[in-house]
From Swiss-Prot:
A GO molecular-function annotation: guanyl-nucleotide exchange factor activity
Gene name as annotated: Rasgef1c
InterPro entries documented for this protein: Ras-like_GEF, Ras-like_Gua-exchang_fac_N, Ras_G-nucl-exch_fac_CS, Ras_GEF_dom_sf, RASGEF_cat_dom, RASGEF_cat_dom_sf
Ras-GEF domain mapped to chain residues: 200-446
Protein name, entry field: Ras-GEF domain-containing family member 1C
UniProt-annotated stretches for the region Disordered: 1-35, 443-466
Described purpose of this protein according to its UniProt entry: Guanine nucleotide exchange factor (GEF).
Record GO biological process: small GTPase-mediated signal transduction
Family annotation (SUPFAM superfamilies): Ras GEF
Keyword Calcium: no
Domain of life: Eukaryota
Native source species: Mus musculus
Keyword match ATP-binding: no
Length: 466
């Protein structure tokens, strides 16, 4: 099986090998495309560039980039069918007598391609018809080498295990428990607070990192493309990907939940001294997240503390030592397109590349900004050029961004999970937005006329009071 790909493996456009010598209609695939790096080409040429021969194997950079971006133009199952058809046609695998020496050289490269494809994009092989294409072409070369059958069996076994693991999506991690929303403050006798479950900021930062990496593990690279897919003007129908970005959506929901959990924990206590204590606790948790490299939890905590129901608690904030909070806010300041955060992210990425331990390898980006960057890359450049060619240069940049993310999400979490803490993070009830405002007004009375009118409205709608 292939080793795990790294960002440097995936994207080294200047080192792409020349494509195979077979020609495709209207173009010579044997001609290097921009010194080996295909800036643009027809879809047929790019597919041909993916197909191995006895003497040619595409670079890892090309394989990842094309498999990632091709789904904008062709369904993965159709792409595999075309690759298999080209293999059969070019290697004459439909003939009764095969050139065994040549087929053995080709077969090893074909199995390598299939191994890389199933390892990096396992969800492309969820349909039985896709597996059928794979087993058909391998079945044709198996008589030339008795090891091919066992190697394919192992490949499929690994694939099925990976699909089964991915099928246990993030939602299953919390079992049957579903978070509920508070509308009003519950009696203190029945409410559990986070500080009662975990009072050490570093421990909570570790457990948040555990949750983040577990959720990231389920996001496939293809979801970044499928989230923004538009109908290809040269394709007959739009690929149906609406059900294939669930993990991205679930991860964004987790970020929002953490924001609301932070705000809920702050607004819940009746006394401002306790509220100030909770704020200072979360500031310390956020600082530990920053030190670990967990920027997503860091941003969620800061966002939760900046929600209006929390930020308006002036008497509470007056009791808080805010110096550390302002430093963290500065790091995540959106000014200059988050330039401070991007500098910190580059520092964490460099630390990860030179790491001597799993602890130093952790890089969890602010996910919503990553999605935004990919969205603007997609919107800012056309998928096809005016001549109909695929804009492969755009997809090299896309692969660079996604490939880096894939490297980060594959890091093993070095922190031991504490089920009681992660269970609380997933299932603790949180206030709705209106509930947060009502709790905030009950903690510190409304000051402006607008706040007084809103408080009156919330008391009427939620509590049934006037």
């Amino acid at each position: 099986m292939p080793r795990t790909l790294t960002a440097s493996d995936m994207v080294t456009p200047g080192s792409l090998s020349p494509p195979p010598t077979e020609s495709t209609e209207g173009e010579q695939a044997g001609q290097p495309l921009l010194d080996g790096a295909p800036s643009s080409a027809s879809l047929d040429t790019l597919i041909q560039h993916l197909v191995p021969t006895a003497d040619y194997y595409p670079e890892k950079a090309y394989i990842f980039t094309f498999l990632l971006s091709s789904r904008l133009f062709i369904e993965p199952r159709e792409l595999l069918a075309r690759v298999c058809h080209l293999c059969i046609e070019q290697q004459q695998l439909d003939k009764p007598v095969l050139d065994k020496a040549r087929v053995r050289k080709f077969g090893a490269k074909l199995l390598q391609l299939l191994a890389e494809w199933t390892e990096t994009f396992p969800r492309d092989f969820e349909e039985e018809s896709t597996i059928g294409h794979l087993t058909d072409v391998v079945g044709r070369i198996s008589p030339c080498d008795e090891t091919y059958g066992s190697r394919v069996h192992q490949l499929l076994q690994t694939l099925h295990q990976k699909l089964a693991s991915l099928g246990q999506g993030p939602e299953s991690l919390v079992g049957a428990d579903k978070p509920i929303s508070y509308r009003t403050k519950p009696p203190a006798s029945i409410h559990r607070e986070l500080l009662g479950v975990c009072s050490d900021p570093y421990t909570l930062a570790q457990q948040l990192t555990h949750v983040e990496l577990e959720r990231l593990r389920h996001i496939g690279p293809e979801e970044f493309v499928q989230a923004f897919v538009n109908k290809d003007p040269l394709a007959g129908t739009k690929p149906r990907f609406s059900d294939k970005t669930n993990n991205v959506e679930a991860y964004v929901k987790w970020f929002n939940r953490l924001c609301y959990l932070v705000a809920t924990e702050i607004c819940m206590p009746a006394k401002k001294k306790q509220r100030a204590q909770v704020i200072e606790f979360f500031i310390d948790v956020a600082r530990e997240c920053f030190n670990i490299g967990n920027f997503n939890s860091l941003m969620a905590i800061i966002s939760g503390m900046n929600m209006s129901p929390v930020s308006r608690l002036k008497k509470t904030w007056a009791k808080v030592k805010t110096a550390k909070f302002f430093i963290l806010e500065h790091q995540m300041d959106p000014t200059g397109n988050f330039c401070n955060y991007r500098t910190a992210l580059r520092g964490a990425a460099h630390r990860s590349l030179t790491a001597h331990s799993s602890r130093e390898k952790i890089v969890i980006p602010f996910f919503s900004l990553l999605i935004k960057d990919i969205y603007f890359l997609n919107e800012g450049c056309a998928n096809r050029l005016p001549n109909g060619h695929v804009n492969f240069e755009k997809f090299l940049e896309l692969a660079k961004q996604v490939g880096e993310f894939i490297t980060w999400k594959q890091v093993e979490c070095p922190f031991e999970q504490d089920p009681s803490i992660t269970h609380y993070l997933y299932t603790a009830p949180i206030f709705s937005e209106d509930g947060l405002y009502l709790a905030s007004y009950e903690s510190e009375s409304p000051e402006s006329q607008t706040e007084k009118e809103r408080w009156k409205s919330l008391r009427s709608s939620i509590l049934g009071k006037t």
